[in-house]
Amino acid sequence: MFMDATHPQHNPVISCGWIKRGEEHPIKSNTGRRRLNINGAIDVQRMSAQIRFDDTIDAISTIALFEQIERANPLAKRITIICDNARYYRSKAVSEYLENSRIDLLFLPPYSPNLNLIERFWKFFKRQVLYNHYYEAFNDYKNACKRFFRELDSYIPRLRSLLTENFEIIGN
């Protein structure tokens, strides 16, 4: 599994548009100060995700995600999760939880988001939900994000081609 958090803001992300030269096209926007905190892990073998919407991403919300992952994988003896070096993944509370857990964390080298497949997943999520979409109310925005995860099965064919573990080893 690959794990990371994302923090999309309640504001449209304009990815492309065709506007005739000399014309203006107003784009609706919000304050952009409200955002969601989404912590998640994706299993690229089964194309399934465990997702949490939390007020903040910290050690407590990370442990809650671990518990959710363990409940979703009752038959697994060990669960390896690949993640970045976020402070909350290395916290004392998380380390203590992992001592009696079936989860093993495998930390990626610093500054290597290209090795964490969930980064591609988050980009796909944002492309589907945020790009060129305007949500007047924050609740509409939050519901659209939640709908994406509820309907994740409909995206599996595209995700299978996007979330491949084709890494090339270079150097020694």
Residue ranges and their predicted role:
Residues 2, 51, 107-109, 131:
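Structural signal for conserved beta-strand scaffold positions within catalytic alpha/beta enzyme cores
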Residues 93-102:
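Catalytic-core regions built around general acid/base machinery
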Residues 119-172:
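C-terminal anion-handling pockets and recognition modules
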